[in-house]
Amino acid sequence: MLIPKRVKYRRQHRPTRRGVSKGGNRVTFGDYGVQALEPAYITNRQIEAARIAINRHVKRGGKVWINIFPDRPLTQKPLGVRMGSGKGPVEKWIANVKPGRILFEMSYPSEEVALEALRRAGAKLPCKVRIVKKEDQF
């Protein structure tokens, strides 16, 4: 699982989901990528599920890059607890994703296998995504 090794403050404010991605919106490492089309909080479990879906489909010969990291804690109070008495414990770690952000990149010799693997990875994510190619970018 992807979680930070250490953090300065254990609990943070919830990040904003407005706006578009300022950087990280081009395929730089691989040949194909998964691009977010709407804002979302993506948890470390969802990132891991998408990574496993890619690796199971391509078997060998390709390379996968994960361009997001869940560095923000999301807290939640237990069920049935009244309001007050402090902020709840950390429930999960999230990556704040804005529209336009490239989430995963991949290079593989066969184009149709790579696109199918990225399509399966997109099904594991909580937001709408599209598959982009490196040569399609301007």
Swiss-Prot record:
| S-S bridge residues | none
What UniProt keywords apply to this chain's record, in alphabetical order? Ribonucleoprotein, Ribosomal protein, RNA-binding, rRNA-binding, tRNA-binding
Which CDD domains does this one have?
A: Ribosomal_L16_L10e (cd01433)
The record's GO molecular-function terms, alphabetically, read: rRNA binding; structural constituent of ribosome; tRNA binding
Q: Which Pfam families has this protein been placed in?
A: Ribosomal_L16 (PF00252)
Q: Does the keyword Ribonucleoprotein apply?
A: yes
Q: Which GO terms describe its biological process?
A: translation
Q: Name one GO cellular component term.
A: cytosolic large ribosomal subunit
Q: Family, per the entry?
A: Belongs to the universal ribosomal protein uL16 family.
Described purpose of this protein according to its UniProt entry: Binds 23S rRNA and is also seen to make contacts with the A and possibly P site tRNAs.
Q: How the protein assembles, per its UniProt entry?
A: Part of the 50S ribosomal subunit.
Task: From the Swiss-Prot or TrEMBL record, give the protein name.
Answer: Large ribosomal subunit protein uL16
Source species: Corynebacterium kroppenstedtii (strain DSM 44385 / JCM 11950 / CIP 105744 / CCUG 35717)
**What is the taxonomic lineage of the source species?**
Bacteria, Bacillati, Actinomycetota, Actinomycetes, Mycobacteriales
> Gene that codes for this?
rplP
